[in-house]
């Protein structure tokens, strides 16, 4: 068998790839061994006696399948864990994610007009103070706060209406008493005359 090291080197240079990617037709070894220049190698490539092998695929099918299973909680038991809980998911990262979620929600609610800037500021500081464990807790708190504010407003309006009615009644009574007094005075003056 002829030594084709030179031809392989030249072919790799012409094809701009590594020597392991160069395929030479084993049936045409005698013709390939005569090629001793780049020009001759180009001719062999054109004729299809020398070919660049395709890139090997490194399939991600199995790893995708494993990741899908891990999302469902498989393969994550005690026996599969190497690092501490803090190393696997740092508490600082958990805290940052939670704060970003809560602050994004507060911003969205403020911009859409669901909460005013005062309630936004109060809830922002409460979120910073670790009051809300998750997004749902914050949403429920906002709903409760709004319901409480509406109830307080309704009670205040009712009290104001009650006060206004009582004041109007007092004024009517005072007016009636004044009129009665005037009538008595006029009646007394008539009697005296």
From Swiss-Prot:
Q: Which UniProt keywords apply?
A: Cytoplasm, Ribonucleoprotein, Ribosomal protein
Record carries keyword Ribosomal protein = yes
Q: How does it assemble?
A: Component of the large ribosomal subunit (LSU). Mature yeast ribosomes consist of a small (40S) and a large (60S) subunit. The 40S small subunit contains 1 molecule of ribosomal RNA (18S rRNA) and at least 33 different proteins. The large 60S subunit contains 3 rRNA molecules (25S, 5.8S and 5S rRNA) and at least 46 different proteins. eL19 lies in close proximity to the binding site for eukaryotic initiation factor eIF4G.
The primary gene name is rpl1901
Compartments, record wording: Cytoplasm
Compositional bias segments (type: Basic residues): 164-174
GO terms (BP aspect): cytoplasmic translation
Q: Give the UniProt family note.
A: Belongs to the eukaryotic ribosomal protein eL19 family.
State the superkingdom: Eukaryota
The free-text function statement in the UniProt record for this protein reads: Component of the ribosome, a large ribonucleoprotein complex responsible for the synthesis of proteins in the cell. The small ribosomal subunit (SSU) binds messenger RNAs (mRNAs) and translates the encoded message by selecting cognate aminoacyl-transfer RNA (tRNA) molecules. The large subunit (LSU) contains the ribosomal catalytic site termed the peptidyl transferase center (PTC), which catalyzes the formation of peptide bonds, thereby polymerizing the amino acids delivered by tRNAs into a polypeptide chain.
Q: Which Pfam families match?
A: Ribosomal_L19e (PF01280), Ribosomal_L19e_C (PF25476)
Q: Where is this region: Disordered?
A: 156-179
Q: What is this protein called?
A: Large ribosomal subunit protein eL19A
Q: What else is known?
A: There are 2 genes for eL19 in S.pombe.
Gene Ontology, cellular component aspect: cytosol; cytosolic large ribosomal subunit; preribosome
**Can you name the source organism?**
Schizosaccharomyces pombe (strain 972 / ATCC 24843)
Q: Which GO terms describe its molecular function?
A: RNA binding; structural constituent of ribosome
InterPro entries, from UniProt?
60S_ribosomal_eL19_sf, Ribosomal_eL19, Ribosomal_eL19_dom, Ribosomal_eL19_dom1, Ribosomal_eL19_euk
What Gene3D superfamilies does the annotation carry? Answer: 1.10.1200.240, 1.10.1650.10
Q: What is its main location?
A: cytoplasm
